[in-house]
């Protein structure tokens, strides 16, 4: 009976293997690193690169956007060190390395032509930084509620985020930590990743990100990357002055189409973007408000979102 109990516990705490330990997973190898990717649509259609949130998230929660494959070759990739991409030395996980990886993905799927790109949350931060560094590589860009783009919004983000938190939010973590001894380890990162994945999949309804009564679906995320979060965002949450990047640098050189999509319910939604980010963006930027929606409208309101995106990409 004890053996059966252990088996049941292990099954409930299994952590999905990365491409390093599961040869059946699709990947693209670029400069010696295997990024987990899933693509949808005809390869001859215009490529659309989808950049997920985090840092430390994965692309699974954005798969409802695969309906855009009717008109695009849609590329979802898990960023280095998170999702189902292999784990790496945490010191190599930086904002700049994330931008360099994005450049690898764009060059691989762009076939020497400008691509279309969509970034959500942290992914929106990366896209905005990328537009300033490589404006010629993108024809159409969509950014969805980037939390931090410069030192000013870093301070605002952290202040507002902490104001929305309660010590009760940390209680589930203890339960997850107590479960970690039962987790099998192959790459040495499963236990911390398990705790973070469970926290991300708690689907807490309402604020600070969603509308009242609204929550992400169960198991929206496949596997979090704790080191990515711990190395890139946690230091900023502890001390916002640690964020010294200016992701708006050279943004005026981007001449392509640009859509900012933000919600009415999220604490970094429409009003936040208008106050901290929109004044710095190019004149051609369109700002679309998702009324009665929250931060994850791409997942929870996929039909509306894809309709707006299709219109923008026309």
What do these predicted ranges mean?
Residues 2-47, 71-72, 314:
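Alpha/beta-hydrolase fold catalytic core
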Residues 82-118:
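Active-site loop/oxyanion-hole signature of alpha/beta-hydrolase fold enzymes
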């Amino acid at each position: 009976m004890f053996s059966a109990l252990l088996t049941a516990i292990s099954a409930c705490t299994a952590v999905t293997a990365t491409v390093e330990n599961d040869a059946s997973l699709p990947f693209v190898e670029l400069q010696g690193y295997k990024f987990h990717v899933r693509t949808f649509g005809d390869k001859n259609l215009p490529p659309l690169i989808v950049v997920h949130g985090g840092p430390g998230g994965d692309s699974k929660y954005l798969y409802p956007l695969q309906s855009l494959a009717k008109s695009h070759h849609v590329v979802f990739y898990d960023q280095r060190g998170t999702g189902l991409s292999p784990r790496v030395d945490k010191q190599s996980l930086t904002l700049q390395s994330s931008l360099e990886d994005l450049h690898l993905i764009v060059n691989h799927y762009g076939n020497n032509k400008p691509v279309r790109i969509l970034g959500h949350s942290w992914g929106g931060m990366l896209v905005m930084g990328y537009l300033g560094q490589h404006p010629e590589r993108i024809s159409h860009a969509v950014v969805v509620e980037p939390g931090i783009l410069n030192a000013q919004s870093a301070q605002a983000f952290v202040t507002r985020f902490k104001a929305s938190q309660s010590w009760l939010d940390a209680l589930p973590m203890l339960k997850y930590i107590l479960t970690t001894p039962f987790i099998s380890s192959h790459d040495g990162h499963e236990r911390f990743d398990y705790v973070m994945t469970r926290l991300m999949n708690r689907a807490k309804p309402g604020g600070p990100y969603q509308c009242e009564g609204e929550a992400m679906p169960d198991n929206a995320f496949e596997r979090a990357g704790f080191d990515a979060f711990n190395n890139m965002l946690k230091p900023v949450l502890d001390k916002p002055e640690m964020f010294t990047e200016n992701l708006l640098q050279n943004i005026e050189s981007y001449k392509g189409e640009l859509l900012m999509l933000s919600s009415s319910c999220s604490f970094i939604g429409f009003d936040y973007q208008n106050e901290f980010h929109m004044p710095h963006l190019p004149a051609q930027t369109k700002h679309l408000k998702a009324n009665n929606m929250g931060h994850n409208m791409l997942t929870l309101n996929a039909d509306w979102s894809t309709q707006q995106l299709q219109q923008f990409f026309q």
